Structure formats: structure tokens, C-alpha cells
Amino acid sequence: MLDRLVLALLAVLSVPYALAVRLRALAYGAGIFRVKQLNRPVISVGNLTVGGTGKTPMVALVARLLMARGKRVAVISRGYGGSLEGKTHIVSDGQRVFLSAAEAGDEPVHLATAVPGLMAVIGTDRYAAGLLAQERLNPDVFILDDGFQHLRLHRDLNILLMDCSAPLGNGMVLPAGLLREPPLALKRADLVVYTRCTGAEAPAVHGAIPSCRAGHVLAGVELLPGGERQPFTALYGRRGVAFAGIADPDAFFASLREEGVDLAATVSFGDHCPYGEEEVARLMAARRTAGADFLITTGKDAVKLGPVLSRLGIVYAAVLEMSLMDPKPLETAIDKVL
């Protein structure tokens, strides 16, 4: 009974929220709110729901596709969770990474580290961050990370990611559901990419919008810091403790087990969690209790371990990549922008 009352209250609260975000989108569409435009093409990657749909590996995939076409690529990120959040800074010029994850947030630092040659800037004002990149880095094209709701910046290609198993969550907007906007916002997308697909046909919520399917692939492990990529078989015969501070840690742990990694224990932290004394203590206690030989985590978590890494013993980072099952729609959409 109590659960129903709570859900009913959340549903009531969802109404003004949905109305507010819908009116905001309409105001931008009608020109009441000004949309600013950079003088380079902008490709936005975002989603309708909160939580993990694979934005970071998708940004990396799009960046690699663009770079394979000879383009200089810069990612514009908010810098969420970093001490410099709200300020405009260059994270990487494609050769060097200037800021730590503690300063710039885990996602831009992870992307700049994982994709050689990728430039990255941060700023709450993504237009100002883009102007800084144009002046200092001279990119050919921008990728706007988590940009579907950042309507203030014009984009030439609007890529929307949707989880294959639950593309609209429970169909309700925050706080009763997972949707950041009402489902009508889907119409702003130029391309829908269904993520976490396992081979089955994707749902058909995209209507006439071009779509493709993608799956998450663990491509191996790297011994920290800076080790070469190895297959998961390098871990066979040993027991590990997996940990993650991401939106869906359980999916990460399940993927490791599917790769044959013997996990003696798992430890979940909050999304974008910084690693300090409390987190180190939890990890070391879990490792001792389980009698594990190593720790293993995500690439996004790995970039935050620098100050504490030497205290954790043997630590591996799993390499997560996005694999397209039908790449043609994405490649066609990108080529139209260039």
C-alpha cells in the first residue's frame, strides 16, 4: 500500500517536471531561447533516460570513425564531478592530457586517454568550451557528450542512445521514472542507436527515424598503470574483486563473469565516485576477506585511481568498447555532416 502511495506521489510530481522540460524544448524550437552555433560541425551523443546507455563508449566509437576519415576531433563535455566543473578548460590537445579526473571529471579524461589523438574540453557552457577549442585546438568537428538535452548549442547530427531492453524505461519522466523528457522528445533525434543489444531485433519506438543496433564488448584488460592490452585468459586461474562507480555496476560485473573472470567479490560505489581513504579501505577489506589475487575495474574508474593506485596492489582495467551490428546508418549519417 505504501509503495503505491509513493508511486502515486511521484507520478503527480512528474507532471510539472514533464511540462517544464517540454515547454523549454518548445521555446528553443520556436526561437524564443537563442540557439548558438559553432563554425564547425557538431555531433551530439545523448539519451532520454538517466543511467547508463553507453554514452562514453559510443562517443569513443564516433570519434574513431571521424578520425579514420582524417578529421581532427574534439569532445565537449560538462566535466561533471570534477573540481573545475562550471569552468571552461582544455583537458587534452590530442597529445597530452593536462587535467586529472579529479579536476575535469572521469569521462573526458577517460576518453582522452582511451582514444589517442582525441582532443577534449570541458565547460558547463558548451558553446564557450567550443569557442575555446576552435581558438586553441582547431578541430574539424566536435562531439557533444551527453548533449541531447543541451538545446542551447546547435548540432548538425543528433544521435540518441536507447537501451535495447527498456528504451523508455517505465515510460514515466522523473521522478516517477527514468525519462529526462517526455517520449515526444524522441522526434528531435536524427539517428537512434539501440545499445546493449544481444542480437535480437531492437524495439521499434524510433518510428521513421533511422536506427542501428550496438552491443557492449569487453575487449580485454590492461594492467594499471599503462599496461598493454591482454585477453581475459590472462586472468584465468586467479581470483579477483571487481569494483565500479558507474550507473550500472551489476551489468559490468556480469560481463566480467561472462568472460570467465573468477570474481570472489564485487564492490559497488556511486556513479562518478572519487576514490579516497574510505573507498580504499573498502577495497582492501574486500580483497583480504575474499583472498583475492587482484582487483579489476572499468576504464572510467581507472583514471581516478592515480593518487591511491600504489596502495591497491595488482589492479586491472577492463576495456569496454561499442560494437555496431549494423553500422551503415551511423556511417551514412556521419558522412552527411562532413
Swiss-Prot record:
Annotated keywords: ATP-binding, Kinase, Lipid A biosynthesis, Lipid biosynthesis, Lipid metabolism, Nucleotide-binding, Transferase
Catalytic activity: a lipid A disaccharide + ATP = a lipid IVA + ADP + H(+)
Pfam families: LpxK
InterPro entries: LpxK, P-loop_NTPase
Entries under CDD domains matching the protein: SIMIBI
Function description: Transfers the gamma-phosphate of ATP to the 4'-position of a tetraacyldisaccharide 1-phosphate intermediate (termed DS-1-P) to form tetraacyldisaccharide 1,4'-bis-phosphate (lipid IVA).
UniProt superkingdom: Bacteria
Protein known as: Tetraacyldisaccharide 4'-kinase
The keyword Endoplasmic reticulum is assigned to this record: no
Binding-site positions, ATP: 49-56
Similarity-based family: Belongs to the LpxK family.
BP-aspect Gene Ontology terms: lipid A biosynthetic process; lipopolysaccharide core region biosynthetic process
GO molecular function, one term: tetraacyldisaccharide 4'-kinase activity
Classification via SUPFAM superfamilies: P-loop containing nucleoside triphosphate hydrolases
UniProt feature coiled coil, ranges: none
Enzyme nomenclature, EC number: 2.7.1.130
GO CC terms in record: plasma membrane
Pathway: Glycolipid biosynthesis; lipid IV(A) biosynthesis; lipid IV(A) from (3R)-3-hydroxytetradecanoyl-[acyl-carrier-protein] and UDP-N-acetyl-alpha-D-glucosamine: step 6/6
